[in-house]
Amino acid sequence: DKDNSQESMISSNSLSFGKNRGEAYYSSNPTFYVGIDCIIFGFNEGEISLLLLKRNFEPAMGEWSLMGGFVQNNESVDDAAKRVLHELTGLENVYMEQVGTFGAIDRDPGERVISVAYYALININEYDRKLVQKHNAYWVNMNELPPLIFDHPEMVEKARELMKQKASVEPIGFNLLPKLF
């Protein structure tokens, strides 16, 4: 019986269950960080650009990175992505789509981090320039991207492909046009 085998598997782990059986189960498993990486596309002078930051913290200080942060205890991954985008650009109510989950064991040399990547399409004329400068971020033409840290090149490529597919069937590109249109 499938249920009995699961029950015996749990009890065979010799866990001591106190008042809260789930507490012991969860405490016997590893914990790790859940990160958010935002691939922020913008339209600039007829070209698609990507908002990157030059890291001023370890690991990989001084290298190019996507904008990112960590999921907090009180938020969903979608809410965390919106918060990260807002904290770094000042923008709200921006079209964002989940790109995927990136979880290679050694993807971040600092700690074990599983990252959920999102792409955003923004009007390059509407972000908070002072906030972006504060985070040491720069717009870089997609055809001139510098080497990126960790698995960020893979995230960018996957986001680019998703954006192309979506743009061929939906009018998502309107997010990049100035309000004049």
What is the predicted role of each segment?
Residues 1-4, 13:
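Intrinsic-disorder-associated, low-complexity terminal segments enriched in Asp/Asn/His/Tyr and depleted
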Residues 17-23:
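Short Pro/Gly-enriched beta-strand edge/turn motifs at strand-loop
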Residues 23-65:
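N-terminal strand-loop-strand
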Residues 36-38, 98, 118-120:
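A structural signal for short, well-ordered beta-strand segments
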Residues 47-91, 170-181:
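Conserved Nudix-box catalytic region and its N-terminal flanking loop in Nudix hydrolases
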Residues 92-100:
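A short coil-to-beta-strand element that immediately follows conserved catalytic motifs
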Residues 106-127, 159:
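Active-site-adjacent beta-strand/loop module that shapes the phosphate/pyrophosphate-binding cleft
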Residues 119, 128-162:
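NUDIX/MutT-family hydrolases
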